[in-house]
Amino acid sequence: MKKTIAGGVWPVMITPFTEDNRIDYDAVLRIIEWYDKNGVDGIFAVCQSSEMFELSPQERVELAKFIITNTPKHMGVIASGHCAEKVEDQIREAQTVIDAGVDAYVFISNQFAKENESEDVAKKNIEYLLDHIDGDMFGVYECPAPYKRLLSPELLKWCAETEKFAFLKDTCCDLDQLEAKCKAVEGTGLKIFNANAATLLRSMEMGCAGYSGVMANFHPDLYVWLCKNYKEQPEKAQELMNFLGAASMVECQVYPVNSKYHMNLVGVPMTLQSRRQDYKLLTGSKKLEIEEFCAITETFRKSFFGK
């Protein structure tokens, strides 16, 4: 495996399904190609956006392997699927994905301890997982479900000092916390990726390495530009950030169904099937909102890039 992962944009990959509710691997390939076309740095596979809690253990592993195998070599792949109840099953699934060649296996932070348990318990359980999984690069995702466990700067620093952690998908959505976390891992190999669009620019100025969030399933190219150019073109970056922050409110709609509808609009065909929620919740008016969102994004894109 690589010893580090690239900064930049890592979309949280959605999972397309066939009409009879199987994983649509042809559509998975089309999504990978679309990510590549839009210049992202890597893919975060088998995460909450992938509906990992609704996938069987076998599906989680097979999906991860397929994405690892079919992603172009210039793009990275990290993957989770860390949602088995028994720790023995967690270890076995993680090892299978690592052995398939993933760049980093990503743990779910709420799996480290129960909601009422302390961070000391979480730390001991992290140590146990590291001792029983043969891998040299890991990540952590502060997944909101089934409950959100945010890592303290102190625990994050400890993770960095193990020299085995390269990735944190941070979901605190709070600039003060992000600044403290960035300071805690400064000079280490652990990179923090913000999942929150509105705070992204400020967080990168504080030291975050990039974006790993929902909106990279709508207009990843804009996030790629921001991550690559915010230092050299700060005024233009702020203009873009104003649009991205406002546009990110679309994730409060019927996600991930709305992203699947949007993918169809931009030439990546798939069904709207979802195991997380009824796709019919994306009503006619909500579809129209996504169509208008797509149109205004294109208008902004042409204005911003002068095309």
Language-model regions, residue ranges each:
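Short secondary-structure capping/turn micro-motifs that flank functional sites
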Residues: 51-52, 113-114, 176, 201, ...
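Active-site beta->alpha loop and helix N-cap motifs at the rims of alpha/beta catalytic domains
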Residues: 2-150
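C-terminal alpha-helical cap/extension of soluble enzyme domains
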Residues: 8-14, 38, 208, 215-307
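Short secondary-structure transition/capping segments
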Residues: 55-57, 117-120, 180-181, 205, ...
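Catalytic alpha/beta core domains of metabolic enzymes, predominantly
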Residues: 128-136, 143-255
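A generic alpha-helix structural signal
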Residues: 32, 64, 94, 182, ...
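General structural feature for long, well-ordered alpha-helical segments within catalytic domains
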Residues: 24-27, 31, 59, 63, ...
